[in-house]
């Protein structure tokens, strides 16, 4: 999974913590 601030997609489990911010395109 991806860490905070990492570029991400809209996949729910793409980020280790929290979810992907669709506006910034980064993990929150």
From Swiss-Prot:
The record ties this protein, via InterPro entries, to: Conotoxin_omega-typ_CS (IPR012321)
Tell me which residues bear Cysteine amide: 27
Molecular-function GO terms, alphabetical = calcium channel regulator activity; ion channel inhibitor activity; toxin activity
Predominant cellular place of this UniProt entry's protein: secreted
Q: Which PROSITE patterns match?
A: OMEGA_CONOTOXIN
Tissue distribution is:
Expressed by the venom duct.
- Disulfides per UniProt: 1-16, 8-20, 15-27
Has UniProt tagged this entry with the keyword Oxidoreductase? no
Q: Where is this site: Essential for calcium channel binding?
A: 13
Keyword terms of this UniProt record: Amidation, Calcium channel impairing toxin, Disulfide bond, Hydroxylation, Ion channel impairing toxin, Knottin, Neurotoxin, Oxidation, Presynaptic neurotoxin, Secreted, Toxin, Voltage-gated calcium channel impairing toxin
Organism domain of life: Eukaryota
What's any one GO cellular component for it? extracellular region
Spell out the subcellular localization from the entry.
Secreted
* List of residues that carry 4-hydroxyproline: 7
Q: Which residues carry this modification: Methionine sulfoxide?
A: 12
Q: What else is known?
A: Found in injectable (milked) (IV) venom.
Q: What is known of its domains?
A: The presence of a 'disulfide through disulfide knot' structurally defines this protein as a knottin. The cysteine framework is VI/VII (C-C-CC-C-C).
- What the protein does? Omega-conotoxins act at presynaptic membranes, they bind and block voltage-gated calcium channels (Cav). This toxin blocks N-type calcium channels (Cav2.2/CACNA1B) with high potency. Unexpectedly, it does not show any blocking activity at amphibian neuromuscular junction. In vivo, when intracerebroventricularly injected into mice causes shaking activity, and, at higher doses, causes mild tremors. When injected intramuscularly into fish, it causes paralysis, and, at higher doses, causes death.
Q: What family does this chain come from, according to its entry?
A: Belongs to the conotoxin O1 superfamily.
Protein name per its UniProtKB record: Omega-conotoxin-like CnVIIH
**What organism is the protein native to?**
Conus consors
